[in-house]
Amino acid sequence: MQEENIRESIEVDVLIIGAGPAGLATAIKLKTEANKNNQEINIVVLEKGSEIGAHILSGAVIDPIGLDMLLPNWKELDPPDMSEVIDDRFYILGPAGSLRIPNFFFPRLMSNHNCFATSLSNVVKWLGNIAQSLGIEVYPGFPASEIIYQEDRVVGVITGDFGISKEGEKKDSFMQGMEIRAKYTVFAEGARGHLTKTVIEKFKLDKESDFQKYGIGLKELWEVPEENHKPGLVQHTMGWPLDNKTGGGSFMYHFGKNLVSVGFVVHLNYKNPSLSPFEEFQRYKTHPIIKDMLSGGKRLSYGARVIREGGYQSVPKLTFPG
């Protein structure tokens, strides 16, 4: 109780947990609308990563309609390098061969033409700079650890303590987390945020939704020889190396200066206990149509993250008290 009495506390109008594309877009939209109406609004965005974009792994194909609505002049705001999609391919893979599915078989919503291939991490960093230029306070390195409730309403969060040893002891550099109270709190933590889960459970936001389903996505960023690079190529596959009882697929996006984002997704309802998504990803890269594009290149970075796959019917109610 004594620690709670000395805990630093600040109050804001809107608190957003997570400085990903959703969290930053929310902050920018709120701020620009407030500015249009000559209203003052204090917005704080907390990000657990050490810097904006640190936890964003996906190579991305971005439909510019979202940017057009959020920032109509976005092309004049020095956006990150983007390659317009000019070649959109889908293959079914076998152990040695492949079958390309003609584009006319796919519904319009699956077409990537007029979209842009880019690094989502760089897009998020760019959005972060725009948010800060608008006067939005963005705090990287500040994870939200606990939700504050008052009369069954969310009124803010408590940030994590700093200066804790691996044994759980307070070090000389210990700094207690602070309370950030807000009129409105937005949780934009990603696919399986730990605070989001507690909010969903407390307010039973998923009682009318189907069960959520998840996959694991593994991604690498490669720099390839210029002769292997096809700017604007977006390629997706399904099939090998996964068997017909295991769901998943792959993506490959060519963008920037000889950069290729390659990823592999495995649905987490697979039955084979010996299956390793990592090993399947490595096997996938030995397929001729993948190997030929990566040959002579070097891997620059890699990572993995959970992906929501339940679809629209699994989306919980998105509003709650607070």
Regions found by a protein language model. Give the residues of each.
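Extended hydrophobic secondary-structure segments that form protein cores and membrane-embedded regions
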Residues: V14, N42-S50, A182-V186
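Conserved Rossmann-like nucleotide-cofactor binding loop
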Residues: A22, E51, R192
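Helix-loop-beta segment of a Rossmann-like dinucleotide-binding subdomain
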Residues: L99-L120, N129, G156, V265-V266
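Predominantly flavin-linked oxidoreductase catalytic cores and closely associated redox partners
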Residues: Q39, S121, W126, I130-I290
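N-terminal Rossmann-like FAD-binding beta1-loop-alpha1 element of flavoenzymes
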Residues: V12-V44
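Glycine/serine-rich loop-strand microenvironments at binding/catalytic pocket rims
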Residues: M1-I17, P21, G135-F142
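FAD/FMN-dependent oxidoreductases across multiple families
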Residues: T246, N272-G322
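N-terminal FAD cofactor-binding segment of flavoenzymes
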Residues: E40, K48-G97
